[in-house]
């Protein structure tokens, strides 16, 4: 467990963003990438390690997509030759004044410990410290926000379709959603591979505060810079009232996730921070 000996912030820092999906990762990327000492490259979500190791996440088929777009072509080279991925970010950190780079891909939350070790080793070979970031959101709120995003993309967002889509989601419990909701797995994997002081693990509901942002900057070994608190990125809001029976189904589905967070971060007041999950995730066994 832990990083390679002898690496210091003089080499810069690589941020490995592991989500969770719909838990502030787009806002996080926007704030970090706007720093003068940061360069996150040509994508926010590179989807390399999930494409290579998590076919169930649905990103492996991107290998077959058109190579006409430069971004797609460059990404294919990373997948075909993963060493290029590490070399690319190392090259960004060699630019004058750049101390921070990274890949913030929410589906990385499902990566296995052995994959995290390989990522860690790839940057250790280049003497670059890696700092994982994992943000968790009220699991019921997160799924509701995810479903709204999907319906909005399809131009089908209204009260009736939202309620019915959530009802169907509770019945099907698809793997792609479960992968991104398993906070317990991500916490376990991070604990197995990294030292506690190498990780920034917090809640979406606490992210937008000076104290949380200062802690993040400390973990990343960069000076504190005030983010744009008012910037909104990929916000999913409606006035739809979700029926209690669906909230109960979501609570039953997400109870193991809630239990894992309580066990790991029991010092937090989840009744106040995650009111929906606290009310509806009643079976923590």
Language model features: what each stretch is:
Residues 82-89, 116, 120, 187-188, ...:
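Generic structural signal for well-ordered alpha-helices
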Residues 71-72, 103-109, 165-179, 234-248:
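Surface-exposed cleft-lining segments at the edges of enzyme active sites
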Residues 44, 133, 137, 178, ...:
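The conserved 3'-phosphoadenosine-5'-phosphosulfate
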Residues 111-133:
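ATP-dependent NMP and nucleoside kinases share a basic, alpha-helical "lid"
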Residues 126-146:
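Conserved phosphate-donor/acceptor-positioning beta-strand/loop module used by diverse small-molecule
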Residues 1-99, 103-105, 153-166, 194, ...:
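PAPS-dependent sulfotransferase catalytic core
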Residues 75-82, 108-114, 178, 205-210:
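Acidic-and-aromatic substrate-binding clefts and catalytic sites of carbohydrate-active enzymes
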Residues 24-29, 48-50, 57-58, 108-113, ...:
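Short catalytic/ligand-binding loop motif for oxyanion handling, primarily in non-cytosolic enzymes
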């Amino acid at each position: 467990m832990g990083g390679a000996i002898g690496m210091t912030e003089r080499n810069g820092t690589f941020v490995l963003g592991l989500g969770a999906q719909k838990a502030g990762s787009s806002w996080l990327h926007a704030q970090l990438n706007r720093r003068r000492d940061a360069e996150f490259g040509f994508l926010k979500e590179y989807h390399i390690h999930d494409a290579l190791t998590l076919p169930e996440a649905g990103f492996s088929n991107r290998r077959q997509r058109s190579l006409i777009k430069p971004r797609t072509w460059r990404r294919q080279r990373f997948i075909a030759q993963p060493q290029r991925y590490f070399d690319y970010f190392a090259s960004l950190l060699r630019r004058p004044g750049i101390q921070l780079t990274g890949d913030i891909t929410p589906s990385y939350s499902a990566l296995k410990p052995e994959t995290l070790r390989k990522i860690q080793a790839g940057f250790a070979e280049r003497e670059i410290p890696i700092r994982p970031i994992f943000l968790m959101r009220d699991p019921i709120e997160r799924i509701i926000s995810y479903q709204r995003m999907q319906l909005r993309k399809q131009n089908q967002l209204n009260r009736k379709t939202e309620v019915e889509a959530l009802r169907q989601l509770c019945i099907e419990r698809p793997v792609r959603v479960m992968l991104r909701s398993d906070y317990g797995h991500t916490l376990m994997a991070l604990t197995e591979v990294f030292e506690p002081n190498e990780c920034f693990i917090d809640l979406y509901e606490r992210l937008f505060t000076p104290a949380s942002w200062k802690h993040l900057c400390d973990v990343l070994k960069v000076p504190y810079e005030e983010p744009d608190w008012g910037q909104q990125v990929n916000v999913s809001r409606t006035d739809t009232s979700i029926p209690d029976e669906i909230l109960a189904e979501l609570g039953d589905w997400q109870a193991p996730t809630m239990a894992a967070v309580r066990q790991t971060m029991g010092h937090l007041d989840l009744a106040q921070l995650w009111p929906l999950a606290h009310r509806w995730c009643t079976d923590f066994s």
